[in-house]
Amino acid sequence: MSNYAPFIKPYVEYNEHGWGPCEVPELDVPYQPFCKGDRLGKICDWTVSLPEKKFPSKYASTFGNSSQYAYFYEDDDSTFHLVDTTGSKAFKPYQRGRYRPNVRNNVRARGRTGRGSQAVGGPGGPAAGGSTANSTKYGKGRNTRNTQNVGRRFGRSAPTRLRESSVMVQSDWVSIEEIDFARLLKLALPNIKEGKDIATCGSLEYYDKLYDRVNLRNEKPLLKMDRVVHTVTTTDDPVIRRLSKTMGNVFATDEILATIMCCTRSNYSWDVVIEKLGTKVFLDKRDNDQFDLLTVNETSLEPPMDEEGSINSAHSLAMEATLINHNFSQQVLRIGDQEPRFKFEEPNPFEEQGVDLASMGYRYRQWDLGNEVVLIARCKHNGVIQGPNGEMQFLSIKALNEWDSKGSNSVEWRQKLDTQRGAVLASELRNNACKLARWTVEAVLAGSDQLKLGYVSRVNPRDHLRHVILGTQQFKPQEFATQINLNMDNAWGVLRCLIDIVMKQPDGKYLIMKDPNKSMIRLYDIPENAFDSDCNDDTESSETFVHSNDN
């Protein structure tokens, strides 16, 4: 036992009156509050020449900036002071990039720049040689209507205004199919050959090349052209009635085909009536003039929202754009009894005695869509021009109109048209993507050699009756389709898909309608007398379009 160290019993305090130790020594150590989020740094860093100016206190303590936590080792009572109740400025610790706004993924930032980084003419297409993003740099070109979004909570936008349907769906209509745009965009029908001419009618006037020199310094007023343009539908066309007896099984006009083939770019509601008689299908339009009106800023982020009756309402702007397009397409031609005209094989099928008809050439063309589907459609040209080698080049003449650059969220034409025409065209491709796509499809279907675009603006934003021509531009339809990301294979695929669905249905009357508030089209089975009342009321308005005298 002597080899082991002695065991000494430790002293254990026993508290008879409570828990814990009986006595605690006074250490007199002050308590300094701290934060676990404080950054750890060096007391002195000799590797830098100057202290950091942007964040000089990034290593400071969160609780070290208030005098109430300061410790003074003094025995004198003079160090006693009251607690400062005025409050000090809260110290924000250094946190790199924690609350930095992410501009790249900011939805509002993308909306201000107008999608300037996407491909030309796609859904929201960008600049053809320019970008509209530069117009908002340094605060220039800002839209005053965007100030209505200021003050809203994040993720909340203005209430969406529901659009009206082009036709009222009746209770006795049977819904057959609903196809959303996502499915339609996946369709394709490649290797469709150029249309074959079956019949050509009408006569064309020659284009006046002086309008190619029009610019901002040499603008020309838009004149009123009192010439009649027929907008006869498919079943009322005498040439189509004659051709349907011997050839083809699907019949339509270029406006109807373009509306269906470009449906994935449309926002407004529209409808097409279909009549199936045995193996023949007629794509028709209702007896009203709404189908022939040109939309304005349909695909814009801020489409026209003014009330009906205003000069800037959607319907008023559509009427104005349609009249401008009619006047421009006739004014740029060499009109006169002594001027030469290009005449097709047959006369104008809609000619009337004592009526001054507009320059219009009709081509009835045939396409083989496969699976025994033969399409025959009436296409048109607006003018003709002689090429450099003496050949005749047919023109499709259209006009873009500016009504209010500030209210329409677009580029100021009078400032950018001569110097940055690509930015102006990119703005129009963004705001009127559907209308430009339809014009391009119509030019491709007709086999036009050139697509002439005119830029027409109001003399005063508050005056919708007077306009001036600011410039013109021309494109080859196929090249322009590529430029605006218009896939003709997809357009033919959409048309063929709807034709196949109708071919499987029994004989009767059907209607294709674009949903006014959803990205889809609907197919209905409707009664034979569904639109008899409209037919009796609007027969005259559906056959001709005459320039109104009050515009």
UniProtKB/Swiss-Prot annotation:
Region of interest (Disordered), ranges: 105-152
One annotated Gene Ontology cellular component of this protein: eukaryotic translation initiation factor 3 complex
Keyword Membrane belongs to the record: no
Primary localization class, coarse: cytoplasm
GO molecular function, one term: translation initiation factor activity
Keywords: Cytoplasm, Initiation factor, Protein biosynthesis, RNA-binding
The family this protein is said to belong to: Belongs to the eIF-3 subunit D family.
Purpose of the protein: mRNA cap-binding component of the eukaryotic translation initiation factor 3 (eIF-3) complex, which is involved in protein synthesis of a specialized repertoire of mRNAs and, together with other initiation factors, stimulates binding of mRNA and methionyl-tRNAi to the 40S ribosome. The eIF-3 complex specifically targets and initiates translation of a subset of mRNAs involved in cell proliferation. In the eIF-3 complex, eif3d specifically recognizes and binds the 7-methylguanosine cap of a subset of mRNAs.
Record remark: domains: The RNA gate region regulates mRNA cap recognition to prevent promiscuous mRNA-binding before assembly of eif3d into the full eukaryotic translation initiation factor 3 (eIF-3) complex.
Full protein name: Eukaryotic translation initiation factor 3 subunit D-2
Taxonomic lineage: Eukaryota, Metazoa, Ecdysozoa, Arthropoda, Hexapoda
Annotated gene: eIF3d2
